[in-house]
Amino acid sequence: MSIVKSKIRTIPDYPKPGILFRDITSLLIDPEGFQLTIGMFVERYQNAKLNKIAAIDARGFIPGAALAFQLGVGFVPIRKKGKLPGNTISESYALEYGVDHVEIHTDAIVPGDKVLIMDDLIATGGTLEASIKLIQNLKGQIHECSTIINLPDLGGAKRIKDTYGIDVFSICEFEGH
């Protein structure tokens, strides 16, 4: 875990002053770090009998698709509103100054599918919470949520566990925001 954490770059004051942006692109361009990261997820979920990996737009797609490929399960993109063609359902989540939406195809989850939800990072948990609601609306069973990074000071993982009873597994944590 410390190897993965050491390969994640921190960019101060991005996207605005006071924010420490945890950038996974430095991890992704490092073959050892990226393979180790996906290997850790494979080890955790290889016996979970998952049907689908649902990953959140856009950085969640990278580990999500790699893990789905390794496990031989379906990959479901959860996208920002207006990016998916065809029939979709959407769910809103709060932003610092407003509201945004994510959506999923209505046929992406079959009732009873065992689903892992993935993103690159959990902060407040807003996008994961909206994704949980989407999967539950389609009658999927959420096995767990999984991220590369947890920012525990922002409380998202705890809120997901307390509100939905769903664990959030993260490979590494960073203090602050």
From Swiss-Prot:
Catalytic activity of the protein: AMP + diphosphate = 5-phospho-alpha-D-ribose 1-diphosphate + adenine
Biological processes, Gene Ontology terms: adenine salvage; AMP salvage; purine ribonucleoside salvage
Biochemical pathway: Purine metabolism; AMP biosynthesis via salvage pathway; AMP from adenine: step 1/1
InterPro entries per UniProt: Ade_phspho_trans, Adenine_PRTase, PRibTrfase_dom, PRTase-like
Role description: Catalyzes a salvage reaction resulting in the formation of AMP, that is energically less costly than de novo synthesis.
UniProt xrefs under SUPFAM superfamilies: PRTase-like
Example GO molecular function: adenine phosphoribosyltransferase activity
UniProt family annotation: Belongs to the purine/pyrimidine phosphoribosyltransferase family.
Subunit structure: Homodimer.
GO cellular component, one term: cytoplasm
Pfam family of the protein (one): Pribosyltran
Protein EC: 2.4.2.7
Coiled-coil features, chain-numbered ranges: none
Record's keyword annotation contains Cytoplasm: yes
Name of the protein in question: Adenine phosphoribosyltransferase
